[in-house]
């Protein structure tokens, strides 16, 4: 922990804000509006720059504001994080480290990790020395996260992992991944899972980048061939993988809704997902006085404002116990709708200029539209979010499942004959 971190113990939010304002001005580069840094999720240089900026934040005493002090954070409340976020607007920040490294992986380790795992990995991430990712989805798994078939077998004092994962966000830039593995096939599917903290560059791990329709390659697929891990790589206990994964999903839904106290900075973590400037779009397309454009833009901006207030309301509800943890899916669901409305509105304003023409800003609208469905998939599909809200928030009856209570070895699966 830095000396600056120690000084925050008796500091008010306003005092903290003033100190952050002065420190940012002296230590972090300002973003030039017309030449913002290209912090793309699929570029190695972006991740290297993010690590450098994170090291500055840690040295200055502004890293991990809401993480406990004993793991390298400041141990402060979300009000301090919000104050820092407001002051950091307009400065170059390591935003791509937020999701999934801080808001999902480190948050999950904080909940269920061993003391050694928390001390080693949360601290290293806050120092800018480690990046963590999620290794959950599988090639034949679809939306059934509990149906994983990557195998973990006991061999002496170690675990040997074989199988494959896919759609792992930014795994190429990570040092470790939270990997969900099946370690017992003779119990129902949710009971036979174990979560491992797996080194990405470990012998036996092969990683490949996935090319997207918009030209990005931020997602990866991984193949595990006799990957040997020690007992201390287990997170949350053997056979407790579903409980760990559920905490990950809770934190992922909150992060997708921009409501995590572990997220540092205001804007999106990807340069291609920055807030849309409707005024600039109207100006570029010669529609400044178009009533229809004004109405569409107003609706999108209003829904974004409602989403932000909703996130605060649900966060406080979960914090004080008046709402269950599963209420995080409400944020996830509403933010997906708000984000898609924003992109639909931008595409409607840009019209054909989003796909043809010489204006790069308008062409970017078209590129972003191609990936509009991502917000309906991250943290589980929109349909899953609705089921979670229905069953775990509103207490509706659960849907019928043919494999409920059946040993996983007896469950018919794709390709199992």
Spell out what each predicted region is.
Residues 7-11, 16, 205-308, 375, ...:
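Glycine-rich beta->alpha junctions and the first turn(s) of the following alpha-helix
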Residues 1-99, 120, 124, 286, ...:
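Amphipathic, small/basic residue-rich leader segments at the start of a protein or domain
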């Amino acid at each position: 922990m830095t000396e600056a971190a120690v000084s925050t113990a008796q500091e008010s939010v306003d005092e903290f804000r003033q100190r952050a304002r002065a420190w940012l001005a002296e230590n972090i580069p300002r973003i030039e509006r017309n030449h913002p840094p290209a912090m793309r999720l699929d570029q190695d240089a972006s991740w290297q720059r993010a690590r450098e900026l994170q090291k500055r934040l840690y040295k200055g005493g502004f890293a991990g504001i809401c993480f406990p002090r004993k793991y390298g954070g400041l141990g402060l409340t979300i009000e301090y994080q919000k104050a820092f976020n407001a002051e950091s607007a307009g400065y170059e920040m390591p935003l791509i480290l937020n999701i999934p490294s801080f808001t999902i992986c480190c948050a999950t380790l904080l909940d269920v990790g061993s003391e050694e795992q928390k001390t080693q990995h949360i601290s290293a991430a806050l120092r800018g020395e480690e990046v963590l990712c999620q290794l959950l989805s599988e090639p034949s798994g679809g939306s059934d996260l509990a149906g994983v078939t990557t195998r973990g077998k006991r061999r002496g004092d170690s675990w040997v992992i074989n199988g494959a994962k896919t759609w792992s966000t930014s795994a190429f830039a990570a040092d470790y991944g939270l990997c969900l593995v099946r370690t017992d096939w003779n119990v129902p599917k949710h009971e036979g899972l174990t979560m491992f903290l797996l080194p990405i560059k470990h012998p036996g791990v092969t990683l490949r980048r996935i090319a997207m329709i918009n030209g990005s390659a931020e997602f990866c697929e991984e193949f595990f061939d006799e990957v040997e891990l020690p007992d201390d790589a287990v997170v949350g206990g053997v056979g407790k993988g579903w409980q760990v994964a559920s905490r990950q999903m809770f934190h992922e839904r909150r992060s997708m809704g921009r409501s995590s106290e572990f997220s540092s900075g205001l804007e999106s973590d990807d340069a291609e997902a920055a807030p849309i400037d409707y005024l600039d779009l109207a100006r570029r397309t010669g529609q400044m006085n178009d009533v229809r454009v004004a109405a569409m833009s107003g609706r999108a901006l209003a829904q974004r404002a409602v989403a932000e207030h909703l996130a605060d309301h649900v966060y406080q509800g979960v914090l004080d116990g008046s709402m269950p943890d599963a209420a995080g899916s409400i944020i996830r669901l509403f933010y997906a709708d708000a984000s898609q409305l924003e992109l639909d509105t931008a595409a409607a304003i840009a019209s054909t200029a989003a796909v043809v023409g010489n204006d790069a800003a308008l062409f970017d609208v078209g590129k972003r539209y191609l990936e509009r469905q991502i917000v309906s998939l991250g943290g589980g599909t929109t349909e899953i979010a609705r089921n979670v809200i229905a069953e775990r928030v509103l207490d509706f009856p659960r849907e019928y499942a043919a494999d409920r209570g059946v040993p996983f070895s007896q469950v018919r699966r794709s390709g199992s004959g």
